[in-house]
């Protein structure tokens, strides 16, 4: 009998075991599409980013003009730039939904997969931050100044650390050059870690909406889920194209159409929408070091989630109290996002402080207590 190349070739075998003959639970829903959508986002961002990098100049006197030149004079440069800028937003939408799905259905109990996923989120946030600095507009410059300055809150070594990161005494040419280098490098680190993420996932297999073992009822990934993923790709790429073609500047800040000027501070310095929840938590604490610690904790808290799981059930599918708490948490994050975009004045300060307090209380205190209560109610 002739050898089946797909199943025996050293390289094709890896692809086959990951994308074709992979045993997959028969009941996973649309919420399991986001992993592959994130892969498509990454590929799109790397391709568009590479094309942009061929025309970009990482120098403070030329960066802004090189981006303008790209949009005006390069064939389809405007489209590539708009796809790249809005692709970042879609990337974050997908990753937040992906994390939310993992949280709801108890996927975090695959600890290695979850922890690498959190590291991927942190690197993605770093990549998006350094990328936002590259066009060298007003918000790029001041965003870089404000966020890098936060490291000065670290006791004893803070100021030295900031000046080392800047390559001088303020955000300037050396900063831009190194941020470009990092922005070019990090997506490939993300791609490498994604493979590790998948390797750990395929050790245990996917979770499913019921949160129970599904070894007795697995189906091949192709054609059942490959066709489902293609539908997801189409919907996402259509959304991206619509955003990039009809309202490319919807999610951007108009301040970034002004070249960076160290002598003029914009009235409201704020990051892109996908960082606003963390920015609101940072601002809600009046102390600099406290704010920085809260900012770090707002994302690093994800590492603790597997340790805070007190329920006897994996998924929230049959846990109505936890479901209510989960949707309160989602609403709370939306409130934080909105508050982060508002100026620092009366109603927003207290709303932000309450929402920040609620965020940590729900995750660290209420979820474990409610899970124990549900165990009692269900006599588990």
Swiss-Prot record:
Protein name (database record): Cytochrome b
SUPFAM superfamilies: a domain/subunit of cytochrome bc1 complex (Ubiquinol-cytochrome c reductase), Transmembrane di-heme cytochromes
Subcellular location, record wording: Mitochondrion inner membrane
GO biological process annotation, one example: mitochondrial electron transport, ubiquinol to cytochrome c
CC per GO annotation: mitochondrial inner membrane; respiratory chain complex III
Cleavable signal peptide: none
Similarity-based family: Belongs to the cytochrome b family.
UniProt keyword annotations, A-Z: Electron transport, Heme, Iron, Membrane, Metal-binding, Mitochondrion, Mitochondrion inner membrane, Respiratory chain, Transmembrane, Transmembrane helix, Transport, Ubiquinone
Binding site for heme b b566: 98, 197
Protein species of origin: Seleucidis melanoleucus
Plastid among keywords: no
Quaternary structure annotation from Swiss-Prot or TrEMBL: The cytochrome bc1 complex contains 11 subunits: 3 respiratory subunits (MT-CYB, CYC1 and UQCRFS1), 2 core proteins (UQCRC1 and UQCRC2) and 6 low-molecular weight proteins (UQCRH/QCR6, UQCRB/QCR7, UQCRQ/QCR8, UQCR10/QCR9, UQCR11/QCR10 and a cleavage product of UQCRFS1). This cytochrome bc1 complex then forms a dimer.
Chain residues that bind heme b b562: 84, 183
Transmembrane spans: 34-54, 78-99, 114-134, 179-199, 227-247, 289-309, 321-341, 348-368
Miscellaneous field: Heme 1 (or BL or b562) is low-potential and absorbs at about 562 nm, and heme 2 (or BH or b566) is high-potential and absorbs at about 566 nm.
Cofactor binding, per record: Binds 2 heme b groups non-covalently.
């Amino acid at each position: 009998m002739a050898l089946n190349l797909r199943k025996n070739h050293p390289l094709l075998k890896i692809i086959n075991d990951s994308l074709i003959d992979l045993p997959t639970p028969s009941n996973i829903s649309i919420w399991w599409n986001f992993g592959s959508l994130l892969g498509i986002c990454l590929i799109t961002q790397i391709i568009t980013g590479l094309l942009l990098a061929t025309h970009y100049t990482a120098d403070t006197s030329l960066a802004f003009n090189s981006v303008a030149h790209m949009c005006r004079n390069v064939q389809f440069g405007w489209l590539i730039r708009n796809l790249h800028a809005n692709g970042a937003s879609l990337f974050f939408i997908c990753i937040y939904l992906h994390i939310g799905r993992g949280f709801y259905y108890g996927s975090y109990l695959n600890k290695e997969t979850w922890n690498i996923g959190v590291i991927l989120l942190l690197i993605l946030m770093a990549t998006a931050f350094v990328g936002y600095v590259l066009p060298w507009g007003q918000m790029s410059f001041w965003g870089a100044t404000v966020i890098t300055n936060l490291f000065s809150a670290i006791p004893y070594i803070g100021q030295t650390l900031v000046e080392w990161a800047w390559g001088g005494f303020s955000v300037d040419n050396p900063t831009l050059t190194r941020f470009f280098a990092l922005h070019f490098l990090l997506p490939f680190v993300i791609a490498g870690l994604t493979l590790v993420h998948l390797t750990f996932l395929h050790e245990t297999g996917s979770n499913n909406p019921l949160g129970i073992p599904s070894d007795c009822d697995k189906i091949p990934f192709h054609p059942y889920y490959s066709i489902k993923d293609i539908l997801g790709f189409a919907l996402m790429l259509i959304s991206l194209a619509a955003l990039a073609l009809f309202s490319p500047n919807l999610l951007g800040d108009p301040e970034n159409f002004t070249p960076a000027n160290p002598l003029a501070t914009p009235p409201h310095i704020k990051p892109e929408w996908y960082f606003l929840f963390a920015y609101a938590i940072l601002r809600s604490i009046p102390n600099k070091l406290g704010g920085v610690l809260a900012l770090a904790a707002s994302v690093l808290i994800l590492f603790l989630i597997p340790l805070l799981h007190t329920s006897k059930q994996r998924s929230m599918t049959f846990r109505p109290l936890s479901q209510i708490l989960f949707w309160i948490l989602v609403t709370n994050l939306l409130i934080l996002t909105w508050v982060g975009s508002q100026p620092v004045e009366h109603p927003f300060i207290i709303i932000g402080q309450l929402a920040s307090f609620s965020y940590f209380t729900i995750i660290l205190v209420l979820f474990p207590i409610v899970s124990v209560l549900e165990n009692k109610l269900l006599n588990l």
